[in-house]
Swiss-Prot record:
Its EC number is 5.1.1.7. InterPro entries: DAP_epimerase_AS, DAP_epimerase_DapF. GO terms for biological process: lysine biosynthetic process via diaminopimelate. GO terms for molecular function: diaminopimelate epimerase activity. The keyword Heme does not apply. Residues 1-44 form a transit peptide. PROSITE patterns: DAP_EPIMERASE. This is Diaminopimelate epimerase, chloroplastic. It comes from Oryza sativa subsp. japonica (Rice). It catalyses: (2S,6S)-2,6-diaminopimelate = meso-2,6-diaminopimelate.
């Protein structure tokens, strides 16, 4: 062996010894938390994923996540489901209407009827509530959404027991109260009955209100009563030919859009189809403006009771059955306010790339 070869061999041996003496980096262990599924929690808890990464790669991934990941809580109120976003640090929504529509897609996104943002309060309100529908449009208010909003606030603020909040919405000030049984009672304010303020082009039939007006849709003459709960509603109990509806027989995907986009409703409309079970018990299905057929609509249930009272079909305090479950609605004479009581609950927690 030449002296040069011997020197090279010695250098390689020394480098190998130094490498062997260097402790191996501990594998990173990433924990994924899943709530609501005990089996999944056990499986995930048993996993330890080794992901040796360079410092540069780790920094890139963390930066990317902080810029693109939207953290949310999925809530539902009688099956009307929403992606709830903590937006208290800004008056600008964290996602655009177009991004919200993608998030709401039930095949390519998270899946929801809308995205709701908890934002800083204005004009003396504790919080501001904004909503993007599943089509990206922005409604003034959502009754089921405001119940979810109240429960989400309680979770964010770690509040226990009964609490009420003043919430600024596109429909004005709304005051929900979390009750001891976990349900949320909401002062929905006063109904708007003047046609131009709803808005509708239908002529008034009772004082300034549009009550049992004729509306031609799909070859039939429907009798409708129009109400705004800060957002427009068209309520019908049947046609001139068919006085009593059996709402389960309706194909909403056919008839709903024809009401929503009818020329008599310049801002489009939500439509409620109602079956009277008794003077204190109503059953409805709804086609929501910007969301289509949904399992529940809180403002719609309020509008239904108002319409039923105006048409002499029901009392001021009713249980309203929706596909997702019942709501308790009361239209009080003393203050002309409508009160809605119903459930809202968290479904799961997650993050989505947007």
């Amino acid at each position: 062996m030449s002296s040069a070869t011997a020197a090279a061999t010695a250098t390689i041996a020394a480098a190998a010894a130094k490498l062997a003496a260097t402790p191996a980096p501990a594998p990173s262990r990433r924990r994924l938390t899943l709530r609501g599924n005990p089996t999944a929690r056990r499986c995930v808890a048993a996993m330890a994923v080794s992901t040796p990464r360079s410092a540069a790669a780790a920094a890139f991934l963390e930066r990317r996540e902080s810029e693109r990941a939207l953290h949310f809580v999925k809530y539902q109120g009688l099956g009307n489901d929403f992606i709830m976003v903590d937006n208290r640090d800004s008056a600008v929504p964290k996602v655009t209407p177009e991004e919200a529509a993608k998030l709401c897609d039930r095949n390519f996104g998270v899946g929801a009827d809308g995205v709701i943002f908890v934002m800083p309060g204005v004009n003396g309100a504790d919080y501001t509530m904004r909503i993007f529908n599943s089509d990206g449009s922005e409604p003034e208010m959502c009754g089921n959404g405001v119940r979810c909003f109240a429960r989400f606030i309680a979770e964010l603020e770690n509040l226990q027991g009964t609490h009420s909040f003043k919430i600024h919405t596109g429909a004005g000030l709304i005051i929900p109260e979390i009750q001891n049984d976990g349900k949320v009672k909401v002062d929905m304010g006063q109904p708007i009955l003047s046609g131009p303020d709803i808005p509708t082009k239908l002529p008034s039939t009772k004082n300034e209100a549009v009550v049992q007006a004729d509306l031609a849709v799909d070859g039939s003459t429907w009798q409708v009563t129009c109400v705004s709960m800060g957002n427009p509603h068209c309520v019908t109990f049947g046609t001139k030919e068919l006085k009593v509806l059996h709402v389960d027989d309706l194909k909403l995907s056919d008839i709903g859009p024809k009401f929503e986009h009818h020329e008599m409703f310049p801002a489009r409309t939500n439509t409620e189809f109602v079956e009277v079970l008794s003077r204190s018990h109503l059953k409805m299905r709804v086609w929501e403006r910007g969301a289509g057929a949904t399992l529940a609509c809180g403002t719609g249930a309020c509008a239904v009771v108002v319409a039923a009272v105006l048409e002499g079909r029901a009392e001021r305090k009713c249980v309203v059955d929706l596909p997702g479950g019942p709501l308790e609605i009361e239209w009080r004479e003393d203050d002309n306010h409508i009160y809605m009581t119903g459930p809202a609950e968290a479904v799961f927690y997650g993050s989505a790339v947007h």
